[in-house]
Amino acid sequence: MTATAESKQRSFPKIEFTDSEAGALEFPSSRSRTFTYYTPAKKRSTMYEDVTVDVQPDPDRHLSQGWIYGFGDGPGGYPQEWTAAKSSNWHAFLDPNEEWDQTIYRNNSKVVHQVELCLSNAKRARVYDGWNTPWLTFISRNLGAWMHAENGLALHVFTSIQRSCPTNMINTAVAVNAAHKMRFAQDLALFNLDLSEATENFDGTAHKEVWQSAPEWQPTREVVERLTAVPDWCELLFGSNIVFEQLVGTLFRSELVMQIAAGNGDYITPTIVGTGEHDYDRDLAYTRNLFRLLTRDPEHGEANKELFGTWLAIWVPRCLDAARALQPIWSQPADKAITFATSFDAATDKFRSLLEDLGLDIPKELDQ
């Protein structure tokens, strides 16, 4: 048998480039040995950006096939319809505090250590023995009542919405806000317990009755409870950090407690309340950035301003009623270093400045 001289012709498929091979796509840092799949805010990406940006993708970014998870009887993922506010790019928001999982524990740990050291030194030096009875009563009733407001906001406002926002950057900032509130409420509870053990003149149970039935605190309690019933996460954030905290929170903490404590021989309370004030300064920074982004949005800015105006019309009157109802507690301490009118004017001036920064109209109720 002889082999055929002719060799069989072989055919090969035509090579087609689909741009799926390595190195085909150009993106930031694509020619570097290390790369990122997003554009950093500055020249180099930060740790915060690396662990938060696009960790929660959506159909507008990367999920071309749509949401890959969701409830069986509901929308998939994190719908933007969970708020009436609109944005042309929710992913443009970055937390100016650059908070992420590690910083929550690191920063809160420092504050907890500071509070524990302050309280242990106070007990060792027996500083509570020098406090007058009216001041002990003021702390037990009013600072104790404020503990309930902080705890309510922590558990039923910020914790409830920290997975409702459309991007991981907003959700992380809200989660940190919840951790701040929760820790501050626990600090106030620890302070209450220490005072109860240190002196017989301090009623460590008075705060519960005050929060539930004292006339001066009922409007504040009503606002907090109304906030917990709001389904729109953006309105919750607006009503809490923009309106309630400005007109009621800073009025009580900054413009009363921090102003009169030293005059009543108390250098412990300002240390503890000051941690809550520092937390709110950081929380207000991210809140201001978020709502400034929404009011300056090229597509939805004007509609958002109109929406926020309706929210102001709802929450400003309620918070003003709560603030004015607190007026009697300004006369309770023995040393009255500041009047309610002075404190109220300072709080409303800060609120006006914040609204002007956001480009919102000043509510007429502030001039009444």
Swiss-Prot record:
Q: Per its UniProt record, what InterPro entries does this chain match?
A: Ferritin-like_SF, MP_mOase_hydro, Phenol_Hydrox, RNR-like
Question: Top enzyme class of this protein?
Answer: oxidoreductase
Enzyme Commission identifier(s): 1.14.13.227
Keywords of the record, alphabetical order, are: Monooxygenase, NAD, Oxidoreductase
Give the matching SUPFAM superfamilies. Ferritin-like
Q: What does this protein do?
A: Component of the propane 2-monooxygenase multicomponent enzyme system which is involved in the degradation of propane via the O2-dependent hydroxylation of propane. Also able to catalyze the oxidation the water contaminant N-nitrosodimethylamine (NDMA).
Family listed: Belongs to the TmoE/XamoE family.
| Protein name as it appears in the record | Propane 2-monooxygenase, hydroxylase component small subunit
Q: Which organism is it from?
A: Rhodococcus jostii (strain RHA1)
